[in-house]
Amino acid sequence: KHVAKLNSEVKVEREGMLHPFRSVFDGPYVDAVKRAVKAGFGKEPAFIREGGSIGAVVTMQKAWKVPILFMGLSLPEHGYHAPNEYFDWGQASGGMKAFVHYFAELAAKR
């Protein structure tokens, strides 16, 4: 409707659709992420709503029946998906420590 107001000659055809994803913000897996990020970076994580349009996530969550959590490591100044996107070693190093901590904690729960 908005596009039609701007230019009535434009025709929009939807070729596909993905279901949106919304992660949980509490529970044992989220608590494990909090501890892992603290171990990797020395700070509490900031939970933000990003990545909800990654189509495979809804399918994975339904198939695996477990919470899907993202541990994004990029910072706003990294220009995520921009022409000059970069990722600094400090984030990579902290991220590796966080993931090792997270997977070790999950393994200990089994």
Where are each of the predicted segments found?
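An extended, acidic, His-containing surface patch that forms the Zn2+-binding/catalytic region
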Residues: L6-R110
